[in-house]
Amino acid sequence: MSGQEKSDKSVDMWSFLRCLGYLSSFNLLVAVCLGMYVRWEQTSEPMILVLFILGLFVSAIACILYYYFSMESASLSLFHLWFGFLQGLLCFLNSPSLEDEIKEQVTNYLLLSSVSIRTLWALTERLCANPKYKPVVITSSELLELLGFGVASISLVFDKSLAMIALTFALTALIIDLRMKSPLALPNLACFSVIAAVTFFQSLKIQTNPFALSCYLGRLICEPLLDVYFSSLTATERWKQFLSAGRLWRRFSLFPLALVELLFFVVCAFKLGNLKDWYLVIPGFCIFGLLWILCHMVFLVTLWCFHTKLSECQKMWAAQRLQTLNLDRIMASRGMRHFCLISERLVLFCLMSTIILGAVSWQVANGLFMSVFLVVLPLESLAHGLFHELGNGLGGTCVGYAVVIPTCYSSADGQPVLLPPGQVQELHSTSTLNAVQRLFSHHLIQTFGCDYSTSLSLETLLVKLRSFLELCTAEGPRHDTYILYYSGHTLPSGDWTLAGGDYLRMKQILDMWREQNSSFSSRLILVLDTENSAPWVKAVRKVEGMYVAVQGAKLSPVQDAEGQDAPRLGDFTSEWVKYNCDPESGVQWSERGRVISAIYGVSKPWSDYALHLPTGSDVAKHWKTHFPKTTYPLVAVANWCCGLNLLWLCSVCLRCVRRLKLSWFPPSILDTGQGIKLVRS
């Protein structure tokens, strides 16, 4: 297909989508006008006629602003605000006498066709037009239609109007929950639909128009619901507006949240007025109410601590922004993933306590209780979704240690010998050390140290390695990844040559790693820029019970000695760092005839590796650091939930498949998930 044909096809698709959008809005306009006319005809209420004429007048103004003054935003704002208001009136101004009216039936069919065409338009756009998703919490059109519907509910008596306004807030929170792709968004949608359809309007004793209500809800929900599947935004992109907001704004947002939670507890307490089953109601409310209070103390403290850690990440992001570091990489380096994994469980307990208290205090005749309950559920599931996304999407913590031995070469007996000063610069070891430091800095890897010395003895190196391998994060757990870099001369077996004729074997490193990592699941990555790294690459493939990888290099002899320089130690590091720090560097490891080729090997269980999940001791330590002692009894419940693994059989099968795939078909590029890729030529 030629470029012109593709362009014509895209124009045709865009025209078709615009026609669908206009047709849906036109059907809604006709339905609203006809519905308002029928209600005025039945009741002869002058206010309905005034609102109907005013609606036509506002629609005309919106069209004039759109077509004659090119004020699209103002025109669409008027349209959505007014039509949200009129749809609300269609819902509430309903009576049994309208059911047999032909015009009312036509109105209902137009409303159904409007929501159906709207859904078809949204689905077609996502399937065929490849829309560009923007990181918005809620669109202006959705917000204006919700505002208009809330204003229309003022036509009811005060208590019913209050419940309807609260239900509008619940719908707003539900739309945000869906757009953020919270794991509990779909259960919340089902809960909202069931409660609203079965009990809420019955408790208010108002007869609504189900077609108008379905049209209103369907038009608002269809796009966020489809985006749960179609949206390609990452977690940090979806939450961008919140994560990049200022510290004061984020902390201030806790106060309305706390007020909503307090309002929920108050309306739950209305249940105590039912003295019919007092022997069940009073003890149940006291027990589960106390549990709810403890859990929500934890909830608010967790959010406060999260804002504190996020503010630290934002400060670091602002300082490093010229280096093109994204916020999620900074959050990963600051241990935000571990904090979010623990917080996810704590917020889940809070959500469960809310559901239990709501069930114990259920009030069939209280519409305000139901609407506030429907507000609280998506708000708490939003917090759970945020911690879930960050806990599963952020990378783990990483620490690195580099050893560069610059001014020596190995004699036949393995004894390091100093080079003349004239040849020291030829080894360009200083640039090698700078490249490693650039790698650590670019990927926010905590630097344990960079040893640059010719007199490094085996005893000194073993002490430093032991200290490096037992290093932990500031929060207490071990780092997820440990990177050990070595550039220098080796024996033919790959062992490192050190001062005094000593050498360091791979077995010594693995023994120390096994000793330090016996009760944990961290991984060790060895990066070797040596002449003889192949023996270690082969040896690591036989290692069991540990997550170890070796990235090595092969230095091939030059075919044309006059036209090409011989490869030197440090050349591989320069290319490998450039490849891992600059995606557009153009380094191609698969090209033929390379004098510097890459090889890597991983231990047998490498594919089983998963980032560290908080243990019971981690949860307990987190609790003692951030929460009051009155909440300690909930630690036992947290530890019990940590041990649950309901899908263990599926995980075993997937583990076997991943192991076979990695051993039989190792990829040419293996992403470690830390921003660093292992490569082979």
Swiss-Prot record:
One of its GO terms (cellular component) is nuclear membrane. One of its GO terms (molecular function) is sodium channel regulator activity. It is found in: Nucleus membrane. The keyword Protease does not apply. InterPro entries: TMEM168. It is a multi-pass membrane protein. The keyword Transferase does not apply. Coiled coil: none annotated. Glycans are attached at residue 517. The chain crosses the membrane at residues 16-36, 47-67, 73-93, 135-155, 156-176, 184-204, 252-272, 281-301, 346-365. Keywords: Glycoprotein, Membrane, Nucleus, Transmembrane, Transmembrane helix. Plays a key role in maintaining the cardiac electrical stability by modulating cell surface expression of SCN5A. Belongs to the TMEM168 family. This is Transmembrane protein 168-A. It comes from Danio rerio (Zebrafish).
